[in-house]
Amino acid sequence: MSRKFSMTPIAHIHSDFAEKFGVPRQSGLVEELEADIVFEPAYQNPDALRGLEDFSHIWLIWVFDRAIRDTWSPTVRPPRLGGNTRMGVFATRSPFRPNPIALSCVKLAGIRQTAEGPVLRVRGADLVNGTPILDIKPYIPYADNHPDALGGFAAVPAGETLSVSIPPALLAQVPAERQEALRGVLAQDPRPHYQKDPERVYGFSFAGFEVRFTVDGDQLTVRDIRPAE
């Protein structure tokens, strides 16, 4: 018998990304990125986190809340393959799934107590600001690490990172503690894989700023940084 399950978010993430564009394609690619996990009132009991401080990494189980559709397709076109080849949805990490659930492994940088309950500081997250978190589990090295694992069409990294050039006057607008994270995000090439026009200006929101850039070959040049409206 088929059963349905209703789940309630235990927390939401506070990250530097207001939109999907610019978010790293996988967790852990830009460890300089920091984000906070803030718990909902019903889950703010510090006892629920007892012992978590002894783990260096955690799993986040979350919802693709910006990609929910009424229907789903058994095949998708992974951007990694240029958007031209179809693969089975269960052989990909596409957000367009029967159940839009995601899994990210992030570094646990700290746990702090606040008047509103405990807050987790994490690094390397690939989530848009406000994304609902369904569950948190510790990463257990002996069980979760598989050196002999095969990676299918994603067996190797997506490619070389880009060389990033940001004029000092533009970079100075970004808080010092966000600058390396911004460089890391840009080096991962935020563009869709099928867009390679060197004249096109791309843009995304990061940490309260609008960032505009172009890419020519393996060189990314930031053209403008200004406060987001």
Q: Where do the PLM segments sit?
A:
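Mixed-charge, low-complexity intrinsically disordered regions
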Residues: M1-I101, Q113-R121, A125-E229
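Conserved positions in beta-strands of structured domains
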Residues: V106-A109
